[in-house]
Amino acid sequence: MRRQPLDRKETRMISQRCREAAWCWAAVWLLLFALAAARAAVPPKIPLKAEPFRLNQVRLLDGPFKHAMELDHKYLLSLDVDRLLHCFRVNAGLPSSAKPLGGWEEPKSEVRGHSLGHFLSACAMMYASTGDEALKAKVDRAVAGLAECQAKIGNGYLSAFPESFIDRVESLQPVWAPWYTIHKIYAGLVDVYVLCGNRQALEVVTKACDWVKARCDKLSDEQMEKMLGNEHGGMNEVLAEVHALTGEEKYLKLAQRFNHRAVLDPLAKREDRLTGLHANTQFPKILGAGRQYELTGREDLRAIATFFWDVVTKERSYVTGGNSDGEVFSPKERLSKHLGPTTTETCNTYNMLKITRRIFGWEPKAEYADYYERALYNHILASQNPETGMVLYYLPLKSGVPKVFGTPNDSFWCCTGTGMENHAKYGDSIYFHEGDKVLYVNLFIASELTWAERGLKLRQETRYPDEDRSRLRFACEKPVEMSLRLRHPYWAASGFEVAINGQTQAIASRPGSFISLDRAWRDGDTVDIRMTMTLRTEAFRDDPKKLAILHGPLVLCAGIEPGRPTAAIVSGEGEIVSHIRPVPEKPLTFIASPKVFRVTGPQAGRELTLIPLFRQYKKPYIVYWDVLGEAQWNATLAEIEAEAARQKALDAQTVDRVVIGDGPSEQAHALAGEKTGAGPHQERHWRHAVDGGWFSYQMKVLDGQPMKLLCRYWGSDSGPRVFDILIDGKKIATQRLNNNRPDQFYDEVYPIHAELTKGKSKITVRFQAHPGNMAGGVFDCRVLKSE
């Protein structure tokens, strides 16, 4: 039922009460706004066309975003500052009795310390979002602890690992990502200064930046460029930010030295060379280029950011707005083939939203806000467990894979850190303004905006997306003349209505644009917005027969029982969405007909319930569906049966098997090697050796009988992957992996002659990389009977 508008008298009464409660608080924050603005010593050369309101000008109201923020708030308060500081103090030679944290923060991790940087940023943002002084007290203590560590070391260096890590990255020796970690620490200090007014944070970060300058002054441009081949976060952004805060030109020049030309120069020429690159390594470089554009006016830097945004959002992203598979940019012409358990790293989307927010400020176009909404609901909100507040690393898009959430004190992945920030800053992109004459409403999130400079308070009341409407309510002492710009979402093609004080407006609007309402806004004015949500499908650009189901901006998924199902839409007559019906009295809940929406496994033949992906956190699920004809579906079922029979026969033929990547199995087979490692891909695990390295297993054989060695490979592996396979030191094969069978696993079988098994119950199988090459990855290794 459509909500009836309040009459003028009722509206004024509510507005007066809201105003009385708000203006005193607003005055306090207005003083803080002025102080924060004064902290910027260097005005941008490129003023923003649309400026975001500060977090402390926006308060969330009840809804899914406030709930997510409150869970994050609770988690931040639970974290022990002394435990976060432990490795910093140990590294500085200071005593620490705190229990070390686990995961990526354990004392031997090469990125230890990154989480404290994220913690500082998140607490500063949450303080601005809530005003909770307990958060400010925690960050003040953390900054004081960092200052003590920096003073003890004595040369400005500040990290939780020794400075020798920087020696290693400068000399191109193996090390994880020291500059990446340092960037997180510096960015946290900047946020604490800007959002909390902690002067000591600025003092610490400027001393640290002076240390960076002293290190980098010793490097030639060629040496810098080579060093930047190691992941280095957003050093080119945070140094530019310190320049803006201090006015010191040396920091801007230093920021420019951290511009990774191998990546940025092609983008400036509108060349997409992203395929195969580690995705999250690149996003901070783009953010840095964008910040430098604002401070210098260099158009090539703007071109880098806008072209990157276009390519990633329009050609390299999934329906959720996320991107990457296995943390890498997949070939965009085969994106539909890259649906695995490690799709869409959450850090990527965190950074893409930051890039989007920045570009929107330069050119306030609705397409930027449309993408922001897509990624915010379908990835960021979906990344948090709504019961525990824990966050995930990857948002998997492979059918039948569940979300995997971290733990409070033993994960601390990169996405744990960005997750702390994600849910602390939901208020930063709901509203924007152009000077004092234009107010943008980008997102339909229940919230209150206090624009004290205009004497205006705007309250957005909504149950969106459970309802397709939102109400804006004005409170002001005197009329405020301005243009109110409302986003008409790209997906609202079936209806977009606006009413002012209950009167429907005749507006010329199109999906994916802003409408302007220009008038003198008075106390008690209301604006009602209604956007018709409909079901629709979105397919891959490279495969129109693989698609997802959406309702309005929301990606829908089908929760299923554990297993590895095959999911398909066996299309009959009519539109696909005509086979989906809403469930009465259950918002955003739908039933998909089992005649059309089919799965294998326990739920075969049963109705499937579709809900928003952000609400599915307990079960494995299906997002993408193959569209097949009846004959194709039957052929698929036959293939599944044939593969099961093949696997059964293979197991019967197997004498011994190493489960690759499984610790007990590899240990039982006496794993040995040099320069070897293991990792996951497509729900399997690989092992490889790099740079001429090797690995070996001891495997059972039948004495004196000919045998076979079966190895499974990923058919898209390529590059320098040439290696020998040896049995007890005797070469039986040389294998080259060079995109042998794209986008699929395949088996190679090598004969083991009887003389190699004579008098033996075990053999040693060794994978030896050629010089400068890799051996593997090997995903399965079996010894088979010859017959």
Kindly give the residue locations of the regions a language model identified.
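Hydrophobic, small-residue-rich alpha-helical packing segments that form membrane-like cores
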Residues: 204-286, 291-295
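Aromatic (Trp/Tyr) and acidic
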Residues: 42-133, 137, 168-195, 232-250, ...
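Bacterial N-terminal signal peptides
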Residues: 24-36
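C-terminal beta-rich recognition modules with glycine/proline-rich loops and embedded aromatic residues
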Residues: 305, 370-378, 383-475, 510, ...
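Beta-strand-rich ligand-recognition modules
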Residues: 503-524, 530-544, 678-708, 712-786
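Short, Lys/Arg-enriched N-terminal segments with co-localized hydrophobic residues
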Residues: 3-12
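Bacterial N-terminal signal peptides that target proteins for export
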Residues: 11-27
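Bacterial Sec-dependent signal peptides at the C-terminal "C-region" and cleavage site
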Residues: 34-44
